[in-house]
Amino acid sequence: MGLKQLHPPKWADRFLRWYCHPDLIEEIQGDVYEIFYRKAAVNKSAPRVQFVWNVLRFFRIRNIKKGKKNHNSSNVNFSMYKSYFIAGLRNITRNATSSAINIIGLAIALGCGVTIFLLLDSYYNRDKFHEKGDRIYLLMNKMKSADEVENWARSPYLLGPSLRDDHNAIESVVRIQRDRLSIRHGDVVFSEPVWFVDKEFFNAFSYPLLHGQSNALYDPTSIVLTEDMAIKYFGRTDVINEQLSVKFPREEKITFKVGAVLKRIPDQSSMSISFLLPIQTWEDHVDAARNIQWRTWAGSTFVLFNEGHKPSDVTVVVDKYIKVQQAANDKFQIQSIEWIPIDQVGKRSYDIKYSLSWSNLPAAMIGIGIIAVLLVLLACFNYMNVAVASVSTRLKEIGIRKVIGGGRTEIVQQFLIENTVMCGVALIAGTLIAYIFLLPAFNTLFPIHVPFHFSSNTATFAFFGGILLSVALISGAYPAFYVSSFSPVKILRGKEKFGSKSLLSKIMLTVQFIISFTTIVACLVFINSSHHFEQKDWGYDHDQQLFTVVKNLEQYNALKDLVAQNKNVISYAGSESHVGFAEHSTTVSVGQDQVNVVRLAVGFNYLQTMNLQLVQGRDFDPNIESDKKESVIINEAFVRKMGWKEPLGKSFEFDNITWYVIGVAKNFHFKEFYYTIEPVMMHIGPEEKFRYLVVKAEAGAVNQVSDFLKKSWSSVAPDDPYEGFFQDEVFQQFFNSNRSNNKIMYFLSAVALTLACMGLYGLVSYNL
């Protein structure tokens, strides 16, 4: 190919002519062509690449073709906005006092807003990390009581598999049974929460694995544990095929090999996992599973539907099995079933009995969100008042701008851009405050961990963009539009006076203090309500009691005999469940009504040991034979529910036995104080089922008795960890959460008061 026949790439030449400015195209095109032919004389292949490179190299802002329309206007606008931006930065340094007040106030308020938004974002996006989450549902049962319907996470053990086998809409069923077992590795032994789950657990849920395979639960000899548990027992995480010994309630010790290690459970998970075992293990080694039937309950049942299917597809089949369950269980009868999406379980768990998840009350979340909005509004009004007060120092600037041709629109734009710059600085500072101080403090106060990231990029941009624009407009709109309306003649003649004495300024100042007052009062009302819980009567004296968990009758008798010899012990008693720590719910028949009650199977001295007060009747008497078989003590809530005026001697049916009321105990709190006290029945239970030994110590000797129990335990059950608790600590998690809420409210009150004071200082500083 000759030199004259060699041409540069046509597409590159067209691209050059497309972007290049008409005034420069002749010069630039001539240069690249000259270079092309000069190189072509030496090398016939390289010049084409060189030509493309030169075309791209000249693709610079100054060489790009400008639009014919509004050419001058775009340059002017760009320069104008740039000058406004620079002026905004200069204004921050020039007016140090007002800028500091505004930025600090906004930063603190926005820092609180960022922290609370992170909390709300985490709360309302719980459990959304599961890849198949849109197809996973909790099978929640609505249980019929005498005059109400309760939501239960428990469901019939056979219901899930029956639905799966009877309908092709269901891909997987995952049942979860919970227990607390002793787990040992060498000399390291702890009592741990263990979940028994169906082998399809990892097919439904997307908990990430650190080591091992997701089919580990298909092996009945495998155990799955979390990263934290691996470090706790082995000091490392790569523990595949290592062995752990698990002690079951029947005193069976079974060795399992580690089949998989879970990464730390995601912060967005509402369920807390420590150990997983195949549910077949529960069926083989736990007493409750000896005779599985439709009366047997699963702790929770989750259903994964096939793609394209939904819960309504199995309505007919569900109704069929509800009738089967009702025929099999006359005590606990399902009225209906509600399918709860997995991402709603954590938010509704406060209203679901026996839920696997922990949830805060919606009112608390809404209240915190409202207070955050009030704080941001307070900071905005604080900014407006200080900005209005500082206008007097910029009146001449505004007048001169108008005289030399500046229109109202340009002045509005100037003030809004300056305000946006300041709000942007405040938002950056507030985000740093949230990251460094507020969020870490929040995470130390509550049992949940809120990460410093949003659920999605969309949420991130929406929040920061939305709050910046909202705060900038709310705080800057009034000063910008009102100031731009000033007459330049009056300004330059000194007749335009504007400051905090104007009517609108007074109105805004009033609104600011109303918001401050409302925020502080709301916080104080919340705090007062929390203090009410702190001072609330438990229904019994709880200062000198402690209790120990026992696994069997041998442990109970051995520890009881040792306790009986301790001079610091006033009384002791055994129980199958215990006030404030473990509850057994059941249904009793009162005439034609089925009533859900809390059942306490106790020893003869239980009421005396726990200081439970009788308001009517008598305590259990070991010398009266009927007290061992058919006598029962109920609480005031039971009496009120049944409407009995004379409860003594009344009877009801439970477990095919007619029980007669011999006493009425004063109401006592079995659960956290925001729960209504439920009806309770107490009866003498068989000692072989006792799982708690409750001890009442002499005044001031409770710690000595606790030490005695710890030392005695090593001789009673050397293979089991000691589990002893003080009775006044059974609601400790509730009180800790309550006190943490108080600290947040105290802090928010202080922030509101600080913002109000800063605004007042800013106003005063401009009027002295």
List where the protein language model places each region:
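Short, strongly hydrophobic transmembrane alpha-helices
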Residues: 27, 91-124, 502-529, 540, ...
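Negatively charged linear elements and acidic catalytic determinants
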Residues: 1-93
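Mid-to-C-terminal secondary-structure elements
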Residues: 198-210, 221-363, 561-737
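Conserved transmembrane alpha-helices of multi-pass membrane proteins
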Residues: 360-364, 448-474, 499-511, 548, ...
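Membrane-proximal extracellular/periplasmic loop immediately following the first transmembrane helix
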Residues: 26, 116-182, 294-302, 306, ...
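Intracellular coupling helices
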Residues: 85, 89-97, 101, 105, ...
